[in-house]
Amino acid sequence: MTTPDLEDKSFDSFGLDDRLLSGLAACDMKQPTLIQNTTIPLALDKGVDITAKAVTGSGKTVAYLLPIFELMLRAEKEKRDIQTALIVVPTRELCEQVSKVITKLTQFCPHLKSLNVTQQLGDDVISSLLEEKPSIIVGTPSRLLKYAKEMDCSKVGYLVIDEADLLLSYGYKEDLIELSEMLPKTKHTFIMSATLNKESDLMKQQFCRSTVASVAVTAAEEERKLLQYYVKCSERDKFLLAYVMFKLQLVKGKTIVFVNEIDRCYRLRLFLEQFGIKACVLNSELPIASRLHIVEQFNKGVFNLLICTDEANKLAEASKSASKQTKEVSRAHEYSSTRGLDFMNVAFVLNFDLPLSSRAYVHRVGRTARANKAGTALSFVVPADQWGKDKVAKLDTAKRDEKVLKKIIKNQESQNMEIKPYSFDMKQVEGFRYRMDDAFRAVTTVGVREARVKEIKTELLNSERLARHFDENPDDLKALRHDKELHTSKVQAHMKRVPDYLLGRKGKLDPNVFVPFRKDDNKIHKKYTKKKKGGDPLKFKKRK
């Protein structure tokens, strides 16, 4: 079935338990989104299995959690056994995020306990927690499969497969099938994703019962306030445009920059440091505790510029090439900055490196324009005739940028969305090139490697040795910043300032707009000083 035209409803109209309504109110959730309006009644009233496709940020997590909680509470009232819910997600970060949402929604239902099996706890600790029979268990397929033998799988009544397409692309298909064979055939299944393909249809046949409701909510139906642009430029000009955009503050609000390789994220960060532009990096090499803390600080506004490595691109390449190291692929299985993570109030997304597919693009730009807020996405595209001319700035995946762009445009048009070309006034930008070249030369390959090692060592120290200290002294945690300058490349102080001659006339203050505290040339004071000139300062002259 497709999404029907629905009138605005409130959560009260679903007949939810008062405790859940109180949890929603505490989370400041007043109005259900379109996907929630569609999914919740189907799950509660008709009891069918559901496959749902909706854009990121549309509220899919709450859409499957609420009906599960409501059915559990109804079973409690009817004095029936509460069946266990398994929530399968692709990454550890997403496990943590889903667990937090569960805690908030069930804060008035203390008997509904949840467990995240991807926590950094020992196997014995996880096993002991499973013996307490939590109502909701969250984890990645491999972790859930590991502990499934210790659980009473016959009690599992609900199965959620979140970010289904990503689970398949990460090679979890066999784990999912093995897990499904251990679960009852009568389980209530939810398959959720921002993009569903033919492989997802196979999952429907594998996991769902005979009665399945398919829900699809397009970006146009969600009325997303997303503006999308692309700029065709050379590989070196990417750095020039990024410098101009961030140094002149042409971009306002929180920004996420996506690159395709870990070395690229450190090169870009060191490059921006040359101009005094602070940024933080997020990639799979960092410890899980650091990654979660970086996302938390970003959401709190501690820093506004985040450079993310899109590991999904690496996995796509690795699946095509048997020579790729399996260690890198397995590490990236547990991480993806483009999927599921709830980056809050992101105003701008910059695809510094274009993704390898239109599907990956959808997930990237989905970080902004969430929850009915406005957002902008800009993508740098390297023309085929410009690729490979700069050995240092060269990126292998950029060779296919123009082909990928055509697929992205076609995909967006099918969603009734538009991506427009954008052109910078290169005559004005050209004046900044010599400073960009100086900064680019200062960031060497050795400097990038040293920055990468230094960052990992620092984050490991923060994650392991200081974890207990921060628990006892939470105020000290405020001093921990992830966007501090790395200083592995020599930073020239003058590069942090933008000379007036580069700004041109537009960069200078307009005397018709600028209002000083004192008027020019002290004209008022001169008026009186002229009258007093030549007079006796000791002589008092009475006014007429």
UniProtKB/Swiss-Prot annotation:
It comes from Yarrowia lipolytica (strain CLIB 122 / E 150) (Yeast). A motif (DEAD box) lies at residues 162-165. ATP binds at A54, V55, T56, G57, S58, G59, K60, T61. Gene3D superfamilies: P-loop containing nucleotide triphosphate hydrolases. GO terms for molecular function: ATP binding; ATP hydrolysis activity; DNA helicase activity; DNA/RNA helicase activity; RNA binding; RNA helicase activity. SMART domains: DEXDc (SM00487), HELICc (SM00490). The Q motif is unique to and characteristic of the DEAD box family of RNA helicases and controls ATP binding and hydrolysis. Its EC number is 3.6.4.13. InterPro entries: DEAD/DEAH_box_helicase_dom, DEAD_box_RNA_helicase, Helicase_ATP-bd, Helicase_C-like, P-loop_NTPase, RNA_helicase_DEAD_Q_motif. A motif (Q motif) lies at residues 9-37. It comes from the Eukaryota. GO terms for biological process: maturation of LSU-rRNA from tricistronic rRNA transcript (SSU-rRNA, 5.8S rRNA, LSU-rRNA). Residues 41-214 form the Helicase ATP-binding domain. The lineage of its organism: Eukaryota, Fungi, Dikarya, Ascomycota, Saccharomycotina. It is found in: Nucleus, Nucleolus. Keywords: ATP-binding, Helicase, Hydrolase, Nucleotide-binding, Nucleus, Ribosome biogenesis, RNA-binding, rRNA processing. It is an enzyme of class 3 (hydrolase). Residues 534-544 have a biased composition (Basic and acidic residues). Residues 525-544 are annotated as: Disordered. It catalyses: ATP + H2O = ADP + phosphate + H(+). GO terms for cellular component: nucleolus. This is ATP-dependent RNA helicase DBP9. Belongs to the DEAD box helicase family. DDX56/DBP9 subfamily. ATP-binding RNA helicase involved in the biogenesis of 60S ribosomal subunits and is required for the normal formation of 25S and 5.8S rRNAs. Residues 225-430 form the Helicase C-terminal domain. PROSITE patterns: HELICASE_ATP_BIND_1 (PS51192), HELICASE_CTER (PS51194), Q_MOTIF (PS51195).
